[in-house]
């Protein structure tokens, strides 16, 4: 180990010589090692024999006792003589004898030793050193110095070869001395004096400090590099102690220089005072410059001026620092003193005396002279290598004088940016002023960008001139008012130019101002803002005056109010105290409350103040526009301005920033209106009632329905208005319930507006209409509820009969209320369910829609829950239509009602042909109305009316086909009411309905969520379970066929936005017929009436669609669809029921489909955003479920029945669940309101495989949706789940009751069932009304008379 170390330590040419003399490769290493020490301690190796002993002492010195492992050459051992030379210096003397020429070369000494005794000992060349290596610790580790080891060994050998090394005091002392010298050499001492002035000896007094230490603040400039000859006044490095005081570092000069420095700074100020301060600074800087110049030279040599980047900071410091300013003089004096010392030392430090002198001069002139490696050829050296120091200092003085005239600050700024200009400038500065300036100017001043405006260039020239004059006059304050004006003028012109040009101009200006570019830009921006603030000053003052003029009066009034209040309060307190002894505590409690309640400091604006405020804001906005980087939005910018600047103009507490913002909105609205628009967006929904019905999503539908509901109420003069006029959506449940009871008697007179969508949007259905619709739904015509939503505006006030029926239905249907809550969709759902129909239509509109849905669902749902669930082929649709016809003719009063409704619908459809939109709406409304009167008169709405009308033809067939028909109608009305209407009338019940149904199903998805859902469900049920829910129950084939027939009018629907829904409209008449046929099928006698209802619902939906040509839009379409959908939903529920009750495979299927459709439609109404197909299904599901429980069965019974159906109910159940969840949206809300919601769900599950359980589409009975509507979206429970849920709780009772009610309602006359919750048939008057509505589609608002 020692060997490697000696190699490291030893590197002396003398050693090599010695090696040459004595072959000893090892020694070579030794020498190299020794050289460092050899200079100080050239010793011989004679001690080798005893190396171990010396080693031990050495270890002490080194902190570890070394034993020599390597054999020392015998020569070394023989060099016992040198041992005396343990002391490094003494050895030097000895070495001379051996090698006088090379006293520093240990090899010669060794040779001398060898020459005496060991010339014969060449083996000596191999040195053995035994070194004891100790484990290193945190404090120390073993270090060996080969030369020292050799010395120690030799000395020991000579002096104490046999003695115990530890007992050798002499050697220990020598070792200690050696150590001291070693450290002296390494860390300081006199040798340093020689080097202290060399450029490379400039030391960084901050070196070694942790730059990242948060405690150390480097923000202020300090002289990082100072000559080694200088140290701080008290030694060390100070942080944040102000200007550093320097003193000579050498021990001898320390005290003198410290004194000098202490006294000199004051002297300098006395001498030069004001002027001197600048000169001092410049002189100091000049010193720096000279240092830098020298650094510059080094730069050329590869050394960079380390301090150049600190120049700016130093500049600042120098301005205030007298001691630093005097530093150069101190250096001069120091140099004089050093001169004498340095001359002898020159040879040691530098190879040539000339070189040595320059370094000293450099140190004297500047703190930062960086490099000692200046070769005599250095260009700048001659400056300092004058023959004598005096000349050198003289030159430095001249340079200082020159620098005094030079703008050092500017130079420093440039230096701070790292521009070589400062360095080279400084360098030249020391040499000659002209050179310096000539170099600085070109480098410092970047050229101006091309193509600047003439005015701008002129102003820049003005700035140049001003800066030049300023420099000549002496630096006092650069940024005078004139200078600021020039800069501001430049800045204002630069604002119009691009950022690149601006940056170029700033870089150019930087050369003329005493700050760097960043500071300049900040100053310009501040000037600009100050000017803007000046512009604000006057308007602010005016506003303040105006406020101060108005405030006294307002303050006086306020004080009067406060006095009056306090008097009243005191009086009250007294009375209270008299009354109660404990009044004091209560009074204390009251006092704060009264203070809060007390008179408000409300400022009353007048036009003058408002105008002044607006003017102020306008100016401030101009300032905002000028800001290059707008970190804040205009709104935040203005608010902060008002908070900080404007608000304080009022007495405290009299003004809020938000009021200022509000009052000045007219001025800043164009910038701050975006958020406002967002906030206002919700408000428009109610306004766009018609359009919204078409476009709004289901969730928005309730609101629309609510809004529309008042209109309907206005239209409906009968008691229905009273009962239904409750809160729009949520109150619709209660309203429907009330209306439901009153609706039964009023079944005969149901007035629905023909154009469900449009009119409903503008005219909310009256309570009468809603009640009638509910009654109709209760009677088993459950088609309207879904459509009723859309048709609500169109529905005209329904007669009292509907209200009575609705009231009765409501009382009977427990589920009605929850459905009503859903709002329009909810009401539809309730109506569909029949029992639920009543409660659903809290809003007249909602009631009407709900009623329609209920009516449709009641009949349809009972008959074929299954059918509703699965898509129905065209053939099935046709069969369903046929069955509907049969049912229509054969079914009891309800069937009759359905028939009449269907007939009306047919008529309506034809009328629609003429004026399809209106006719479709009216038809749908009529159908719905009929259904409502039968099932849920309260729900009768424009949609109901349409449904009623459409039902007129296919009332009986409603179970399957009618539902489809309704869906078609709805869809078509929504998209293109007229066109669809016509196709509906045109297609034969079987044929048209079939064809159009698929389209309808598709259309529904196209339409808005609620409408879409309705339409989709209808279409899907029309094809599988679209609107057929009600009729679907009647005949399973019919459900398939009927919905498909509805699709037949597809061509017509295709014109509409939703292709599928559109066909449904056109197929409406067909569907009605089909529905009738479907209803007729024996499997579903009840279904017949139900079919009729669905047919009506279809009509209503169609009407709705017609009314909202934008049926595709979630809102409008949804509404119209929802009514039909709701009808379907009850149908779905019933469909589940009928399969259980009159289980007929085809019938069941049909019913199921029907129910599915209704549920979907209902849900659709609920969740308008849902795709049309799913949406309509959802809608129908919601309506269906509600209707089923309430409408089909009496109250709870209806709900229970759908539950009963396990197969379809599974679908229904899913729907029901979905409906429940969706009820809050629209159709779902209906379902949720109705306790039998689950029941509806089961029909949904049962009815439609397609209908995947959607949480939202619970009530939405998935119809066999020809259009693949993603029911999953709504989260219908699985079909099975739906069944389970329904049957689990109220499924058995509800399903049974619902089925019974639906069947009964459908079979008996609509009036009968109106009285009974689930009367499947629409009241005669309802049917008539629907029919009339269908005929006068244009007059959607005309009340319909019951035929």
Swiss-Prot record:
Modified residues (Phosphothreonine): 243, 252
Pro residues bias spans: 93-110, 1046-1060
Comp. bias regions, Basic and acidic residues: 16-37, 67-79, 122-134, 574-584
Residue numbers of Phosphoserine PTMs: 13, 250, 311, 416, 419, 422, 584, 1123
Biased composition regions of type Polar residues, renumbered to the chain: 823-832, 985-996, 1101-1164, 1174-1185
Pfam family, one: HUN
GO cellular component: extracellular space; nucleoplasm; nucleus
Domain of life of the organism encoding this protein: Eukaryota
Cross-link Glycyl lysine isopeptide (Lys-Gly) (interchain with G-Cter in SUMO2) mapped to chain: 272
Keywords: Acetylation, Isopeptide bond, Phosphoprotein, Ubl conjugation
Tissue: Expressed in several cell lines tested, including primary and transformed cell lines.
Modified residues (N6-acetyllysine): 1068, 1148
Stated family: Belongs to the ubinuclein family.
Name this protein carries in UniProt: Ubinuclein-2
